[in-house]
From Swiss-Prot:
Bridged cysteine pairs (disulfide): 6-29, 20-26, 25-50, 38-57
Subunit note: Heterodimer with VLO5B; disulfide-linked.
Protein name: Disintegrin VLO5A
Cellular localisation: Secreted
Organism expressing this protein natively: Macrovipera lebetina obtusa
Tissue distribution of the protein: Expressed by the venom gland.
Record has Metal-binding as a keyword: no
Amino acid sequence: NSGNPCCDPVTCQPRRGEHCVSGKCCRNCKFLRAGTVCKRAVGDDMDDYCTGISSDCPRNPYKD
């Protein structure tokens, strides 16, 4: 993905000094801060939050 500024064009891994290439918890090649909402609640659901150590948006563990 040579069009992604976070991605090394040869390996498509994060460039040196960058944390991530893509994901709901990745912005400007860095992980979003822990506690940042990455998925808003719908209905009786609860918000999902970034962990600060991953680009993934984990499911809230307190959901039923």
